[in-house]
């Protein structure tokens, strides 16, 4: 274990307290950003206390026992890609890499069930998926030519944010209507949780370059094989094993920063720490800020953010409806299918088969689901079942046993043009207080990778202030391969997911 950092022995801003004890850090928020910061700081020798208002860890990437169905459900399906180097590093720390199943193939389904499979070939990047695109029935040859031209424009570098939406960029680069609907919209709305006419060009380009162009390894898709809370509860164990503490059902309501300490109020009680990381959503942070001149610039920046929703529809059928683990769904409201009864671990799968007679449990996901927010659960379930039967012939004779709908109304921030100028760095007006969250200045959009990066960046900033020296937790990006190296690929990351791929 790295040596402990005792900031008061070397920091000119420190107090005169006993330096034989590790510095204490409060972390407000038990989502990925807070957990990543907590794990990094605990590893560096800080005494971490993490506060989470819910009875479980994971934030928006969590699961719980649904009272209406009696089933453990994820609030929404989360996936990762091989390019998510910091998320993979976080999973390594938490010891859960073996709970991710990796896939090379991405199946696009049309209504009626016709499938087009995108998978890498032996060709060098960025051409490794070109053969699969040429064979894809869901796109015409004209669509494919248009997509190829746009990919060629994005390959050399990520365009700057000039206030243009990615939809306008696509039209300016000659994209067909079907190429936009069946490729660009399908991929990017799911990745960025926003409509293309509200997405900034740099973030759309980043998703395309990182996941489709950089290398075959970068585009591998990983899906958890356990409920999400099981994935992240081990991060709490990691913090506890290093002398830290996790307080659940204990959200931070207020904070106060002094010269030598910070205090937080949770459940009406005040506790004092040396440092504080605020790893909460931007709207929650806005309600916590003091009404002082020093807080005004941050409050003004937070006022520039807006959110976009995600909806997950969970369906239990009396029989298997598909032999696919997951699929992209085209031309309908439902966007992705995740066959949860095929994805979960063998032990849990056996238990479910005993309870369910070998039926199917699927989750359908709708990103940027503003059109569903005002609809009732029954309306959404009826739509989901109807569309499932269009895509999966096995669902046409299947009986729906139970269902539930989970709406994350404020799931992510909207990555609209110009938003980057308002995304704050981890340092704040209060020297002992730091920010984390996927909405902060990470260089990534609102993804699990962005959340973990924000936690690591906050931990680095705190450790620098505490110890007066540079501490690095952030992992390098995945290296470009093949021809993409001609465009200035970055250094190979400390961790690559090749060994994790499950065929």
Language model segments and positions:
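FAD-binding beta-loop-beta segment adjacent to the flavin cofactor pocket
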Residues: 343-350, 408-435, 439-442
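Mobile amphipathic helical/loop "lid" adjacent to a hydrophobic cofactor/ligand pocket
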Residues: 87-93, 97-205, 216-218
């Amino acid at each position: 274990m790295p040596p402990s950092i005792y900031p008061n022995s070397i920091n000119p801003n420190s107090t005169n307290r006993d330096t034989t004890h590790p510095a204490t850090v409060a972390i407000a928020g038990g989502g990925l950003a807070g957990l990543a910061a907590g794990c990094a700081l605990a590893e560096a020798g800080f005494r971490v206390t993490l506060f989470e208002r819910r009875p479980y860890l994971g934030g928006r990437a969590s699961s719980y026992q649904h009272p209406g169905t009696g089933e453990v459900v994820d609030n929404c399906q989360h996936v990762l890609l091989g390019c998510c180097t910091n998320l993979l590093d976080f999973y390594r720390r938490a010891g859960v890499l073996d709970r991710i199943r990796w896939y090379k193939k991405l199946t696009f389904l049309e209504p009626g069930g016709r499938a087009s499979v995108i998978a890498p070939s032996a060709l060098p990047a960025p051409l490794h998926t070109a053969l699969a695109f040429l064979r894809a029935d869901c796109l015409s040859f004209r669509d494919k030519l248009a997509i190829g031209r746009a990919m060629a424009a994005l390959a050399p570098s990520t365009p700057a944010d000039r206030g243009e939406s990615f939809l306008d960029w696509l039209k300016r680069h000659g994209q067909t209507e079907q190429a936009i609907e069946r490729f660009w919209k399908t991929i990017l709305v799911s990745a960025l949780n926003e409509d293309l006419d509200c997405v900034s060009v740099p973030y759309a380009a980043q998703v395309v370059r990182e996941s489709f162009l950089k290398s075959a390894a970068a585009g591998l898709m990983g899906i958890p094989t356990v409920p999400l809370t099981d994935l992240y509860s081990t991060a709490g164990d990691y913090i506890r094993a290093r002398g830290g503490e996790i307080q659940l059902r204990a959200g931070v309501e207020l904070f106060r920063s002094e010269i030598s300490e910070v205090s937080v109020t949770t459940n009406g009680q005040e506790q004092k720490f040396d440092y504080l990381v605020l790893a909460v959503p931007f709207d929650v942070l806005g309600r916590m800020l003091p009404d002082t001149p020093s807080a005004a610039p941050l409050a003004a920046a937070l006022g520039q953010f807006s959110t976009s929703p995600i909806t997950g529809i969970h369906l239990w059928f009396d029989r298997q409806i598909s032999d696919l683990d997951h699929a992209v769904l085209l031309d309908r409201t439902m966007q992705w299918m995740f066959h949860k009864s095929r994805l979960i671990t063998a032990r849990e799968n056996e238990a479910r088969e005993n309870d369910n007679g070998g039926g199917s449990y699927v989750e359908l996901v709708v990103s940027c689901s503003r059109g569903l927010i005002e609809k009732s659960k029954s309306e959404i379930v009826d739509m989901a079942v109807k569309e499932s039967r269009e895509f999966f012939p096995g669902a046409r004779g299947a009986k729906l046993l139970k269902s539930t709908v989970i709406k994350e109304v404020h799931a992510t921030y909207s990555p609209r043009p110009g938003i980057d100028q308002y995304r704050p760095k981890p340092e704040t007006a209060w020297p002992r207080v730091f920010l984390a969250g996927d909405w902060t200045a990470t260089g990534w959009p609102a993804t699990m990778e962005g959340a973990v990066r924000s936690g690591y960046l906050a931990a680095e900033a705190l450790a620098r202030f505490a110890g007066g020296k540079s501490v690095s937790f952030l992992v390098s990006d995945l290296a470009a391969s093949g021809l993409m190296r001609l465009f200035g690929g970055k250094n190979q990351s400390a961790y690559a997911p090749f060994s994790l791929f499950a065929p």
